[in-house]
Amino acid sequence: MRITQVFLSVNDNSVYTEFVEPVVAQWHRVIPGVRVTLLWCDHRLPPHSWESIPGLDDVHVVVNVPDLVNIPTAITALWARYFFASLISAPGDVSIISDVDMFPLSRDYFVHQLEAVPSDTYAHLHANVPAYGRIPSCYHVASAANFRAVLGLEKGSWTESMLKVWASRKHADGWFCDEDFATCQMQASRHTFYMPSRRHQFDRIDRDLYYDVEMLSLGAYYDLHAPRPYHEHAAKIQSILQAVPGETRPALGHDILAYRVL
């Protein structure tokens, strides 16, 4: 299995939109040749300037039809990644969904560990976080057919799908409803999943931007969950990205491939 397409999404919120260009660039550094599709979920059109962002292959405008008028665009942006990963693909594509403020750091994590995983597998690279209480949106990895089969998206339109997810919400504002719905669908599925355990609890750089210099030089961190807004932290974020090794494999290694049915 090799990731060929990345799905990101935003609404018209500068706190998130300013991440688009640097995050797209970082995905191309980690997975050379990957296609990046940005889902724009808002009542307004996306900025024309995005047409010239290097490496941004497609800006897909998700039309918020009248039936969805009472659902915040931030929530439609969350679920859009799952739905359109099941719809927009070329033959042989394997897609990953991610947050627009997540910077991938490790080629070992996003490329090499998947090399032995069959392409018909549904993978999740960050599922083993019991305290979180649900399977995070980052990082589902699958073909379009498997996104449809596992998440129950074989039938129905974008509108029907979004209304179903919104109806299942556990919080009034709808936050986490995409993850809660996807978690229930995965638990009900009899599909085979690849869900590796985290190597240790300090294998990512979080919003406080704390990291160990030696671990960074070894390639031991797999992603950076960036603080917002980007412009206030850009220098520190870019210094971290520039210090990440290229093909260096981390000395920590991976757990045995974890194939299982939820």
Task: For every predicted segment, state its role.
Residues 1-69, 255, 259-261:
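N-terminal anchoring/stem segment of glycosyltransferases
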Residues 77-125:
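GT-A fold catalytic core of metal-dependent nucleotide-sugar glycosyltransferases
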Residues 145-260:
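Catalytic core and acceptor-binding pocket of nucleotide-sugar-dependent glycosyltransferases
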Residues 16, 69-80:
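A short, glycine-/small-residue-rich helix N-cap motif at loop->alpha-helix starts
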Residues 8-12, 38-42, 75, 97-100, ...:
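Short His-Asn-centered micro-motif
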